[in-house]
């Protein structure tokens, strides 16, 4: 065979050739009567002690694997032989540490696990229940004495299994019943239990009230027939909103957003429109008050406090207002994202001819992202940095119709006082006037965008051009110079120009202004004077309806109507369920 093959010359008799050319690790041709110098002996008796098997009979083999025949460590069930792992107590109770002990409860649980005794501790160490049916003991008798480690005040501790007998389910949660007075025997037993538990337990509501409550409970004097246990209300989680809709039915829908100062009648008009129009052709989105007041923090209460005690030029006040305005804007941004997912962006004003549908919103993202920050900026409560960060989150959709409702400041203040909201006490007439000015400034800026381009608006903000020069270069605007000057003075551009003067050379500022005016131009504004329609909601809606249908620039959008109705029902159900 050729060189490098497996011929007769390549491997000699008895492995001599292999031992000369290459010292193989496994010498399969070696024998007892041959003296080979290439491999190690495979006899089990000649192995060192550390390479012999740990147990079992030694067997001669040609291969040696360095793998022990028994495990090198103890099995899990031998390391953890505590009976707690076998049958946990049911039901679990919280672990109560002595005040003198240091360290966390988790550390105490770990130290308790190392105990080798098979007896249970007075309390369960792990808050889990046995999966076996037989692991649940029967209920204790009614007169069963409570454990010695029970909290002194039942309202301050967790509800155990023995305490569930005295609970009943109500619409407000679980209520723990307690009889007024009671028999002498029952009162004596309760006194003994509390003395055995260590006397009085002071609650964090104050020493004086705690002493009174503990004395009454020690004497067995009942104050009320039921003590409320706070339980979180179980609400439906609307995960169906993010799934692919089963029914797809695109309709022509007008997206109408009602805007204006507080007390102008936005919520009243939303409810009236849902009653005036046919139910199958209208849906609505209320003001997200539940998210503002109950999700994590109450930003509505916080902003009311800042209007009362906030200081102009204070960085802390500006940071708090920025945080509140961000939370105000989040529900509008999520709604806009959901609606954009249901929309056919290429279909404007066409599609199905089954009639026009309406979707009415209480406020637009324009309010928390532009109008209110502009008012706070004017009064110095919001810094320049925070103002432009809020301005950057503003987004709009082609076809959004913003109806600004106007009303006198005196009438608006009277309505605010009449509705009696808890956090509206800081609203004054001057505050309503400043807010109306902010709406008017944004509206004038939008009107300017109907005459000049977005690039020219940005150039006005960074002071690279002016109104006379723009009108001089355009034949169409030759006779509009005075109109544009008046609009420019009443718009938000003078304030933005003053803020951007030190940083107008920065590309970020240029791009920010360009994006903002591009989004603002997508909107369609109409103005309705609510002063002409006192106590006439139908007349006010007729005026808005007429302006929308007579404006050729306002067109409906093709939206999946079943998905939009499902989104609206989920939002309305949450507002009706959680609002007090």
Curated annotation (Swiss-Prot):
The active site is at residue 287. ATP binds at residues 260-267, 415. Its EC number is 2.7.1.21. Keywords: ATP-binding, DNA synthesis, Early protein, Kinase, Nucleotide-binding, Transferase. GO terms for cellular component: viral tegument. Residues 137-149 have a biased composition (Pro residues). It comes from the Viruses. Substrate binds at residues 325, 421. It catalyses: thymidine + ATP = dTMP + ADP + H(+). Residues 1-60, 133-157 are annotated as: Disordered. GO terms for molecular function: ATP binding; thymidine kinase activity. One of its GO terms (biological process) is TMP biosynthetic process. Belongs to the herpesviridae thymidine kinase family. Homodimer. Catalyzes the transfer of the gamma-phospho group of ATP to thymidine to generate dTMP in the salvage pathway of pyrimidine synthesis. The dTMP serves as a substrate for DNA polymerase during viral DNA replication. Allows the virus to be reactivated and to grow in non-proliferative cells lacking a high concentration of phosphorylated nucleic acid precursors. This is Thymidine kinase. It comes from Human herpesvirus 8 type P (isolate GK18) (HHV-8).
